[in-house]
A protein has these predicted regions:
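Ser/Thr-rich, Proline-interspersed low-complexity disordered segments
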Residues: 21-47, 51
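Secretory pathway targeting signatures of secreted, lumenal, and periplasmic proteins
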Residues: 66-108
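Short, solvent-exposed recognition patches
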Residues: 102-130
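Bacterial N-terminal signal peptides
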Residues: 10-20
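Bacterial N-terminal signal peptides that target proteins for export
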Residues: 2-11
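Surface-exposed amphipathic alpha-helical segments
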Residues: 171-213
Length: 213
């Protein structure tokens, strides 16, 4: 994954915002992969990434969660997407989904702007939705914002949905990570996934204080 402006290490990049949320010029989001997307290059496994020569330039670091698999990947222009679900589930039928979107070259969007746009889209798609702040600040020198969205009844699935979203503003690209549930997550699940999201960070081999592992 060298010699590219932004590369990925063990990441999953996903474009399924369950209620049709959109941040930048994103094709219509649905519960199926958008037909206009083409398959993206295969994301390396954890073992292959760890034995590589190292990362170059700006990278999003996010390990594949234990018990999960990459079930869909694609890229269209500057938008890279992947969806990850439990090994026994699929993107068509899931209980928990991990989502990341990478907007390559997008440097004008802030986490606050992303939160406002996505939250409004969520509210427009689901009646009686709720949104709650979780955390904000900087991690490894990059600004981020983490918040929760709740839909009591998704009209397209007839199920409740809880989602935690983490937006990170890089120097080269913009990153959006999502953990979604079609059930009310337990306290243990919330703790588990908050720890996971805290570990999702951006690094840059060109900046010593933000160096990649």
């Amino acid at each position: 994954m060298k010699n590219s402006r932004t590369t990925f290490r063990v990441i999953f990049v996903s474009g399924i915002f369950l209620l049709g949320c959109s941040l930048l010029p994103i094709p219509g989001i649905a519960t199926q992969p958008p037909p206009t997307f083409v398959p993206a290059a295969e994301i390396p496994t954890k073992s292959s990434a760890e034995t590589s020569m190292g990362l170059e330039n700006e990278n999003l670091l996010a390990e594949v969660p234990s018990g999960f698999k990459v079930d869909y990947q694609a890229q269209q222009e500057n938008q890279a997407i992947t969806e990850m679900v439990a090994e026994s589930e699929s993107v068509e039928d899931w209980s928990t989904m991990v989502t990341v979107q990478v907007y390559l070259g997008e440097t004008n969007t802030t986490p606050a702007q992303a939160q406002e746009t996505l939250t409004q889209s969520w509210f427009n798609a689901c009646e009686d939705s709720e949104s709650y702040p979780v955390a904000d600040g900087a991690e490894n020198g990059y600004g981020f914002l983490l918040w929760q969205l709740y839909c009591p009844l998704n009209p397209s699935t007839q199920k409740m949905e809880y989602t935690y979203m983490k937006a990170i503003q890089g120097n080269d690209s913009f990153y959006l990570v999502q953990v979604a549930f079609r059930h009310e997550p337990s306290d243990d699940e919330i703790t588990q996934w908050m720890q996971y999201l805290k570990g999702v960070q951006v690094c840059d081999s060109r900046i010593p204080e933000r160096a990649c592992p």
